[in-house]
């Protein structure tokens, strides 16, 4: 199992640090200072940076980290960091291997939040940026509802015990919306109580798991009759399929 550490960043971001011996990989460093502090505290060398998409709260720390760790490799989608010569452009199904660390990750292209968004999975963990949140999913910027629906369905196909590491602490608010759609979902009722307690203690609610998300995340539950009814009641048009249901769910969440 991977050793994954949480580095809180900005208002509600998480930078994930994968530790293997004295080497580290960080995911979506939206700022450099907390990463540098953690690396120095634990005498770690920065081996690589994983970037899921181009938004500032995911990439603003990259330049300063590379200045301190010039041998560090960067893996991300093509349009993410056009001014970073170390960037190794990742495409769907690419493999990232670190033989000296005995680590290999698979890249999936998951458009929706942005057109270029990618995720990294391996060793029972999924680093999913702003595609999948605990209880939710990312807003649609340069991607479409259809793309995001298919991206989420693809992530849902991973083993249920896969640990899910999103880039934001949105769980409580997301689950509140899920309960609007499924007020009788016993699992979600229990989950939001656990999440509330964690937040009161100042603890992260992450990682989640694919299994937890399939039982509580309304955006992975468009096949459920109660969710379809909730979406239909929010739409003036007849919803013919799960993609349309998803689109209405996302639009309604945007307006809360």
Curated annotation (Swiss-Prot):
Zn(2+) 1 binds at residues 53, 55, 113, 130. Its EC number is 3.1.2.6. GO terms for molecular function: hydroxyacylglutathione hydrolase activity; metal ion binding. Pathway: Secondary metabolite metabolism; methylglyoxal degradation; (R)-lactate from methylglyoxal: step 2/2. Keywords: Hydrolase, Metal-binding, Zinc. It holds the Pfam family Lactamase_B. The keyword Metal-binding applies. Zn(2+) 2 binds at residues 57-58, 130, 168. GO terms for biological process: methylglyoxal catabolic process to D-lactate via S-lactoyl-glutathione. It catalyses: an S-(2-hydroxyacyl)glutathione + H2O = a 2-hydroxy carboxylate + glutathione + H(+). Its cofactor is Zn(2+). SMART domains: Lactamase_B. Binds 2 Zn(2+) ions per subunit. Thiolesterase that catalyzes the hydrolysis of S-D-lactoyl-glutathione to form glutathione and D-lactic acid. Belongs to the metallo-beta-lactamase superfamily. Glyoxalase II family. Monomer. This is Hydroxyacylglutathione hydrolase. It comes from Tolumonas auensis (strain DSM 9187 / NBRC 110442 / TA 4). The gene is gloB.
